[in-house]
Amino acid sequence: MYRLIKQEGRAKRGEFTTVHGVIQTPVFMNVGTVAAIKGAVSTADLEQIGTQVELSNTYHLHVRPGDRIIKQMGGLHKFMSWNKPILTDSGGFQVFSLAGLRKIKEEGVTFRSHIDGHKIFMGPEESMQIQSNLGSTIAMAFDECAPSKADRMYVQNSVERTTRWLQRCQVEMKRLNSLEDTVNPHQLLFGINQGAIYEDIRIEHAKRIAEMDLDGYAVGGLAVGETHEEMYHILDEVVPYLPVNKPTYLMGVGTPANILEGVERGVDFFDCVYPTRNGRHGHLYTNHGKINLFNAKYELDSRPIEEGCGCPACQRYSRAYIRHLLKAKEMLGMRLCVLPVSYTHLRAHETGAYL
């Protein structure tokens, strides 16, 4: 259940109550694709830096180790020792990114595993079943993420199919949540708005899915080739048609500047792999801009990565030391970069310093 605490313009502050705890929004979700944050960051670390929600990937966990194995282990929360909310994406983005390896039909998508090439079929029901086996707090509906510059007719047909798939997801989740052996009988469902860069298609789709009384709504298919200006324009046009009394999630977007722009437009949830991916390579966001620890000027820099940061890395280690670890290819160097960048992103919506 979502409670709107305060609203200024379109910007919202809210509380989203789930079976695994209350989420204060706006919120940035740390991305643990295969149930772990890359860079040797543990769930204990996530708790220490104040992570509210972790995001894992349905497709990757289905392929390895297998969602049925995770169910036998008691669900994803027990498997990764994390007691707070988890959001699982539907696997759709990964499936549709395998352009040469998949075939789309009304029933779903047939594609080949990126690991060993074996054939996999995934449709709305299969995606819901996998996410039910994982037992995540929030499950995302199965959708098609059409390329941002795709032909208008293709996008229109894709969106209509995505709407039908959402209806099937809703029916299947209701069935799965009623089963005696389900891992999480209180699993929530978010629908996804699509439509590439065609604002009229997106607006009509937003109106249709808003009528379905879902637990939350996402704006998908952005940050996949369009400009920032196009993305912000789509948000300006679409978000007003999504229910203000439900959380809004901007999928795959999460630089500090993007977060602030999204919050201003009424977005509650964000996620992005780039902060930790860049951090593992020594490229970090700070309150004073981006830094590259491989630059020679940090060789004798005794300051922490971020002055005043509460993460373990900044509380104890210097830029010079972390730079040394990165150049020596020590795993600890990646870890000590990922911690502060994660800490910073968890709080990016609290400050305008990045703009």
Specify the residue positions occupied by each region the protein language model found.
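Non-catalytic, usually N-terminal nucleic-acid engagement modules in DNA/RNA processing proteins
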Residues: M1-V183, A296-E299
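Conserved small/polar residues in nucleotide/adenosyl-binding loops
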Residues: T344-T351
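Glycine- and acidic
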Residues: S148-R152, Q156, G216-L222, M331-M334
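Glycine-rich nucleotide phosphate-binding loop and flanking beta-alpha elements
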Residues: H60-H62, Q94, G225, T276, ...
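Glycine-rich phosphate/ribose-binding loops and adjacent secondary-structure elements
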Residues: T163, E172, L176, L188-I305
